[in-house]
C-alpha cells in the first residue's frame, strides 16, 4: 500500500469537509427549508485549505504543468545546470511569497470573517502552510540539484 503523506491527508480531509458541508446544506435547504447559515463560509475556508495544501502536495510530486521548450534547446550536459538555476529562482520566488503570506496573515488577523466572526487568520493560515511547504520542498529540490552537480546521489524525481 502506498504511504499517505501528511499534506495529502490534510488536503483530503479539508476537501471531504467541504463536500460534506455543501451536501448537508443543500439537503437542509431543499428538504427542510432551513439552510445552515455558516455552511458557505465553512465550505469556502475548507476549500481554500485544500487548494493550498494540495498545491504543495502537487509541487512535492512534480505534478504541476511545466513548459519544457527551453530545456530542449540546451545540450544534455547543460540540463543539470539549468535545473539548478530553475530551482534557485523558484526557491527565491516562493520564499518571497511565503514571507508576504506571513505578513498578510498577521496584518489580517484582527479582521473577523463575515458570518462566523472568527479571525481571518484561520483562513489565511492556509497561505502560510501551503507556501511554507512549497518553500521546504523547493529548497529540498535545490539541495538535490547541487548534489547532482557535485556528483553525489541526488535523484530529482524523489
Regions found by a protein language model. Give the residues of each.
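Alpha-helical transmembrane segments and membrane-interface helix-loop junctions
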Residues: 1-158
Amino acid at each position: 500500500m502506498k504511504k499517505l503523506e501528511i499534506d495529502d491527508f490534510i488536503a483530503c480531509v479539508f476537501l471531504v469537509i467541504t463536500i460534506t458541508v455543501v451536501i448537508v446544506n443543500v439537503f437542509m435547504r431543499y428538504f427542510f427549508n432551513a439552510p445552515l447559515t455558516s455552511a458557505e463560509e465553512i465550505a469556502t475556508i475548507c476549500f481554500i485549505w485544500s487548494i493550498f495544501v494540495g498545491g504543495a502536495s502537487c509541487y512535492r510530486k512534480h505534478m504541476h504543468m511545466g513548459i519544457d521548450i527551453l530545456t530542449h534547446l540546451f545540450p544534455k550536459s547543460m540540463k543539470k545546470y539549468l535545473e539548478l538555476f530553475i530551482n534557485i529562482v523558484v526557491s527565491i520566488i516562493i520564499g518571497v511569497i511565503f514571507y508576504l503570506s506571513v505578513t498578510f496573515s498577521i496584518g489580517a488577523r484582527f479582521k473577523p470573517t463575515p458570518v462566523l466572526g472568527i479571525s481571518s487568520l484561520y483562513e489565511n493560515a492556509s497561505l502560510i502552510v501551503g507556501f511554507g511547504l512549497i518553500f521546504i520542498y523547493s529548497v529540498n529540490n535545490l539541495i538535490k540539484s547541487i548534489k547532482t552537480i557535485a556528483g553525489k546521489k541526488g535523484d530529482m524525481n524523489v
